[in-house]
Amino acid sequence: MNKLFRSPAVDWPFKFAQKLERARDERLKHFYSQPLPAPDTPLSEVMFLAVDFETTGLNPNKDGIITIGLVPFTLNRIYLRQAKHWTLRPKQKLEEESVVIHGITHNDIIDAPDLSEVLGEILESMAGHIPVVHYRRIERDFLDNALKVRLGEGIEFPVLDTLEIESQIQNKLAGGLWNKLKGKKPASVRLGQSRRRYHLPDYTPHHALTDAIATAELLQAQIAHHFDSEMPLKSFWL
């Protein structure tokens, strides 16, 4: 399926250079000043960073980030000793529905820092890496909006989206006239269901660090099963 995946043609190094010129916050300036891998870098040579957020809801304009999990990895190794996890105190009230999903209560966040207090550490961990997420509108949109609220300026960064990759794979596998006549539909691309197709173990969901590790393992499996690890980074980043 090497020709399957098509990503938008975004020149991320050029965009970072532009953002560096316009950024006002010193933490953002430092983030944009760190070089990204070249677009033609083979996937096998890229240092990725799996990222997962747990939030108070699904709307980045009115909900907030509660926990962040990060873990660096390559296609051959996950660096668990370098994994990081933060619990944050959101500006928004915790709703009962979200507490049921992620299990984080008011007592868990009462003494937690605001995102602004640990932003430098988070951006330092992300700098120079290529984030990998499962559904980019959570991690990218929530962080962008959170920074706009706190700094008056947002953030942009490239990602590999394992949900988007899996969606394209499943659409391809369910395509064709014969499958249409049989009524075959693309399989679910939720994180847990996607992992099971690659015989990856079930993890308890909705913990930011666990889900970040699960996402890293999923990308490794997707590339191993469907793509050539020497394909260029620019074929996948969004």
Q: Over which residues does each language-model region extend?
A:
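Short, acidic/small-residue loops that bind anionic groups at enzyme active sites
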Residues: I155-T162
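Short, conserved phosphate/pyrophosphate- and ester-handling motifs at nucleotide-, phospho-/glycolipid
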Residues: D211
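Conserved non-catalytic scaffold segment of RNase H-like nuclease domains
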Residues: K15, K19-V51, T55-R150, E156, ...
